From Swiss-Prot:
UniProt keyword annotations, A-Z: Developmental protein, Membrane, Signal, Transmembrane, Transmembrane helix
SMART domains named among the record's database cross-references: EMP24_GP25L
Family listed: Belongs to the EMP24/GP25L family.
Signal peptide limits: 1-20
Domain of life (superkingdom): Eukaryota
Lineage, uppermost ranks: Eukaryota, Metazoa, Ecdysozoa, Arthropoda, Hexapoda
UniProt xrefs under Pfam families: EMP24_GP25L (PF01105)
Residues exposed to the Cytoplasmic side: 194-206
Key word Transmembrane helix present: yes
Gene Ontology CC annotation, any one: membrane
Listed name of the protein: Transmembrane emp24 domain-containing protein bai
InterPro entries named in the record: Emp24-like, GOLD_dom
Ranges of the Lumenal topological domain: 21-172
Length: 206
């Protein structure tokens, strides 16, 4: 019973960390998948595309600054991996290329990605450390739990940063509004005094 509950928890944690998608890629188009990844995390992926004679699909993985982390041309089926240097939004793009003389056909692309602790080989760790299967499962669950906690801490930190930014922006907007109102009141007062002196000079008012 306890082992069954442990397996359920492991499956839920794996669903949290692993991402499998399948999509259709139209001829001469590209589709990108983007995700925020913490610093110093290993990202691994497997891809497979439906084969259409004469059509080519390339893939490229890069960060928001355009640095290429992984790239391959004319792909059909394979794997890739890269290490995230800093916390950033990383994207993986699949690019379809079809010759001008050929009528393009929509291709299917499947992608499975893993990051962080999901990239570890716990079977190898268990054999090296001579751990029992249940101990390996517990080790996997512990690492996954730590990873989820770190993700929540990072989300909380980013939320606080965004809240601080919003508060600073609101304070600046309020200060600018008060400053604008003071300028308008000052300008209106100056206009009244100027017109009063003008009308007095023209002897239109006492």
């Amino acid at each position: 019973m306890a082992r069954a509950a442990l397996i359920v928890c492991l499956l839920m944690a794996c669903a949290w960390s692993s991402h499998a998608v399948m999509f259709k890629l139209s001829p001469n188009t590209q589709k990108c998948l983007k995700e925020d990844i913490q610093a110093n995390q290993l990202v691994m992926g497997e891809y497979e595309v439906s084969d259409v004679p004469g059509q080519i699909i390339d893939y490229i993985a890069r960060d928001t600054k355009g640095h290429i982390l992984s790239q391959k041309e004319h792909i059909t089926k394979g794997k890739f991996s890269f290490m995230s240097e800093v916390y950033d939004a990383y994207e993986i793009c699949f690019i379809s290329k079809v010759p001008a003389h050929q009528r393009g056909i929509v291709q299917e692309v499947s992608l499975l990605t893993k990051k962080g602790v999901e990239t570890k080989s716990y079977e190898g760790i268990g054999e090296a450390s001579k751990l029992k299967p249940l101990e390996v499962d517990l080790k996997r669950l512990e690492d996954l739990s730590d990873s989820i906690v770190r993700d929540f801490v990072l989300m909380r930190k980013r939320e606080e940063e965004m809240r601080d930014t919003n508060e600073k922006t609101n304070s600046r907007v309020l200060f600018f509004s008060i400053f604008s109102m003071c300028c308008l009141l000052g300008l209106a007062t100056w206009q009244v005094l100027y017109l009063r002196r003008y009308f007095k000079a023209k002897k239109l008012i006492e």
